[in-house]
Curated annotation (Swiss-Prot):
Basic and acidic residues bias (residue ranges): 380-406, 453-468, 479-491
Pfam families: Ets
Name of the protein this chain belongs to: ETS translocation variant 3
GO BP: any one term: cell differentiation
Organism of this sequence: Pan troglodytes (Chimpanzee)
DNA-binding region as annotated in the record: 35-116
Polar residues bias: start-end ranges: 158-184
Keyword Repressor (UniProt): yes
Keyword Transmembrane helix: no
Organismal lineage: Eukaryota, Metazoa, Chordata, Craniata, Vertebrata
Amino acid sequence: MKAGCSIVEKPEGGGGYQFPDWAYKTESSPGSRQIQLWHFILELLQKEEFRHVIAWQQGEYGEFVIKDPDEVARLWGRRKCKPQMNYDKLSRALRYYYNKRILHKTKGKRFTYKFNFNKLVMPNYPFINIRSSGVVPQSAPPVPTASSRFHFPPLDTHSPTNDVQPGRFSASSLTASGQESSNGTDRKTELSELEDGSAADWRRGVDPMSSRNAIGGGGIGHQKRKPDIMLPLFARPGMYPDPHSPFAVSPIPGRGGVLNVPISPALSLTPTIFSYSPSPGLSPFTSSSCFSFNPEEMKHYLHSQACSVFNYHLSPRTFPRYPGLMVPPLQCQMHPEESTQFSIKLQPPPVGRKNRERVESSEESAPVTTPTMASIPPRIKVEPASEKDPESLRQSAREKEEHTQEEGTVPSRTIEEEKGTIFARPAAPPIWPSVPISTPSEEPLEVTEDIEDRPGKEPSAPEKKEDALMPPKLRLKRRWNDDPEARELSKSGKFLWNGSGPQGLATAAADA
């Protein structure tokens, strides 16, 4: 804590309230050892000197009333070294606990709250031992586990054959048994076994019938009775002089074995073996009653994390480690072998925009060029721009421009000349049908020239497919290297017949 800050000291004698080292929020504020508000309220409720400030509500289980809210806020501010603390801030902190299900506001009563002990802390109420003989576990894990913040020393139950007497739970006998438990060396070894979480402790044979005799032997009327299966598992010794306190004398003797490791009040209040309702506290770290940083347990936890996707209903996170509870084997171990049977086939990447246009244009030009090989005159007369759809004309023109832009070997002067020849041409669409009629002598010559050149230029169907799949730059380079005549024609300005005949013609028509 900060220097010069007055702190409420924990009394050494009877009536004191002992916290383990790990009951403070060390993980969120290292070194400050801050106590949580609900711990502080329980601490005030345990002390006689604060009865005028805060007290248990009579006749209600776990309900308390704040008689002097300003004084409680002042005490809390002094404990936290915050002199500006008031009840508004404190009540906001209490409202935070509503969602955590630690406590809730009692409707219709001012400054009255109720702890959810029956749900939150454990199935049977945690009878807090207020004697100063309780031993604080020094080897507690640094994170909050599925265990209570308080330590409950077990009573002497080494001889399970002894019948439990009804008068055993008088105050004097309880005090005597508490002194025995603090003085006996064999009890200390048992405590150390519990703190270490040894596996032998879980398998210790306890006669369940003796604990049921204890249930029938002594009982208190106002105590809420739990089902028999819960009571033997979560029995706690303890006493408290106030008859209205929930920390009343337990009707069950504490057994030195099963589940004397406490259960966390801040997490899910009931262990998952009794309730399968999902809650934030159902993490694999907190589902077990006894946590240790064991590499085997860590491996088990990581394995359950990996398998939880495949079979969540069989995952170890839903089962705490209790003796005699059979968890079915995990099924996700079969998945690596199954996955090897199926080979993964990757699809080729989708064709880019340029390649897709080239494939479409080659498919368009293919049906047009095949009839030209068969009969020459229809090829020229079918070509007029009025019949050709403007979409394909625009597409081929765009393709031509991309050709010229991608070509790195052609100097910029030639590109400008080519663009000039294309855009300077004043021919309008009506002129094109008259071209074959006006120049009948020149046309057949050019057509035959084109047909002679075509076997070299125009590849067969499989070669066309290869061309379509080839990168555009490589295809352009290959065409450029294969056609010296086309190069010369384009340089001299006759750009129309640089590509395939009809395509070039259509391009010029579109650009005009």
